[in-house]
Structure formats: C-alpha cells, structure tokens
Design a protein with these regions (language model features):
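Sequence/structural signature of beta-propeller domains
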Residues: 20-305
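Bacterial Sec-dependent N-terminal signal peptides
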Residues: 1-23
Length: 305
C-alpha cells in the first residue's frame, strides 16, 4: 500500500552543552497510497491521529473521514451538521472529543466522534476574521497535559506574520462544550506573502509544537517542518522556533506535483509512536464532494528508520 517513491530524510540535532557533533537519525518519507474515494473533491485541510487512526477534516464537505494507515482503508465516515458558511481548516482531539476550527466564520466547534454532534466552543475573545486576502484561522492543536489549545492564524492582515494564540481550557457543563480563555499570542515572521503556516500539532513527548510551513508561487512549492518548544506550564517559547531539516522534502513535493498530486499541504499530525503524517488539500474554491478532483490527495509519512 505504499509508493515505491522513497526519500531518505535526515533530522539533525545536537547538544551544545555536551559539545557533541550533530546526530543524524535516518528517516524515510513515504507516500501512503490512499483509496480512490480520496481523489474526489474531498479538500482535506486538517488531520489528527487518534487511537491508531487518522481523522481527516474536509474543508467544505460535511464529513470527517477516518482512515487506517496500516490497512490503507477508510474505516468510516462521520457525517457532521456544520453551520452555514463553515470552512473546517484544522482538527485536534481533547479528552476523547474532536475539535475543529472554522476559517470563513472564525469559530471553534466540539464534535462527538461517535455521532458527529456539534457544539460551539465559547472563546473569551473573538477570533480574527478572515482577511480580504482570504487568510484566516488555519489550525488548532490541543495540549491535554497542560489543558491548553493553540490556534493558528495563517497570515495577518499585511501578510507579514503568522500568529499562534494560546488558550486555556475552562470546563463546560455536562450539556455544553468546553470554553477557551485567551492567554497570549506569538507571531512567526514570513519572508514575503508567498509564505505561510498551514497547520500545527502537539508533539507532547518532546514538549514541542510542530508547524507546517510552505512557499507557493505558480507550480513551484517549498515545504518545511518547524518546531516551537513548549515550557512546563504549556506556554509557547517563540525564541525556540527551529527548522527541522527534512532532506528532499521540497524536491519530493515538486516531483509528486508532476504526478497529478496536490501538494497544497494543509494538515499535520503525529501519532503515539512519533510518526509524523502530512496531507494535502486537493481542491480550491467550491467543492462538489462526489466528483473527482483535478488533483489527487497525498498522504506523506515521515518515520524513523
């Protein structure tokens, strides 16, 4: 079920305090074959690992697709009753429930993963609205250890920075969703308007936030993986923003683009074993969820060898 296209990926790290030379753990980058239904206009814009499965959030189709990466099959679909003008741009889990963030009308929603029932999440301050350039809230990541949520804004109004907001969790009543209290915001500089951050996820074992960053101009793309350290209280430390070198990430991206794959990478997640997954959104603009898309969805796996 895996592509023969195999790319060796090296993640570099070293300990300054011990004066050790760079360590070069060997990783592989693989294209996990998806079933044909994922080549419809599913426009996946977020992804979360939970219980050994991957939960795909569709930006414009009212469904969450549950995928088994070992079997390479869709386990089930979770229909959801989304509000009008909803654009699901990111998904995470917190205490056995799904949480999605909407871009067009900026809001966070709690989703029952068994029946798809939705409840609105109250935030102590309004989320930034979608800008005139079409940028808005793009990702959400929950930190269960510290009871925090991190919310990603793709680009600010002048397109010079991406922003990540930290919210603390306030428990809700039995029939209500949790609440989120705004605590802080950090900015991540962008070299120019062609750059953006498209998703985030928490790597709790390594106390860091993984960030998916990309450059796009015409058909050419550059892909990057970055990290921000999380302190013991759950606060993001922007001064620790670090590139995680992934050899041939960009080269592989442009090679797959010539094979009719969408390389608009919109979702990132990490499983309990430390395997990182990245997925693309294969449809721009309006979507006809039952029709084939011009490009195929791609699911990439970054794994230690």
């Amino acid at each position: 079920m895996r592509s023969h296209f195999l790319v060796l990926v090296f993640l570099f790290s070293f300990s300054i305090s011990q004066g050790q030379p760079p360590q070069v753990p060997l990783h592989t980058l693989e294209n996990i074959a998806l079933p044909g239904e994922m080549n419809k206009q599913v426009c996946i814009s977020g992804m979360q690992s939970y219980g050994g499965e991957l939960y795909f959030a569709s930006e414009r189709c009212p469904v969450i697709i549950v995928f088994d990466p070992v079997k390479g099959t869709v386990s089930r679909n979770i229909p959801i009753q989304v509000p009008q003008q909803f654009e699901m741009e990111g998904i995470t889990t917190y205490k056995d429930k799904l949480y999605a963030i909407s871009e067009n009308v900026a809001a966070v929603y709690e989703i029952n993963m068994q029946n798809g029932n939705i409840l609105p999440v109250t935030t102590s301050s309004s989320l930034p609205p979608k800008s005139k350039s079409g940028d808005g809230m793009e990702g959400v990541a929950a930190n269960e250890k510290n009871n925090k949520f991190y919310l990603l804004r793709e680009r600010d109004d002048d397109m010079s920075h991406s922003q990540i907001y930290t919210f603390s969790v306030e428990p809700g009543a039995a029939t209500q969703a949790i609440g989120l209290k705004n605590e802080s915001m950090i900015e991540l500089p962008l070299e120019n308007p062609q750059w953006r951050y498209s998703d985030i996820c928490v790597d709790i074992k390594n106390s860091r936030l993984l960030c998916l960053k990309s450059y796009s101009k015409g058909k050419f793309r550059q892909q990057f993986l970055e990290s921000i350290s999380i302190d013991p209280a759950g606060n993001l430390l922007p001064q620790t923003l670090t590139n995680i070198p992934v050899e041939n990430f960009t080269e592989a991206s442009n090679a797959y683009k010539t094979q009719d794959y969408s390389m608009n990478l919109e979702g990132i997640t990490i499983d309990s074993a430390g395997t990182i997954y990245v997925i693309s959104d294969n449809t721009s603009g309006k979507a006809n969820c039952d029709m084939l898309a011009k490009e195929k969805t791609i699911l990439l796996e970054i794994r230690k060898k």
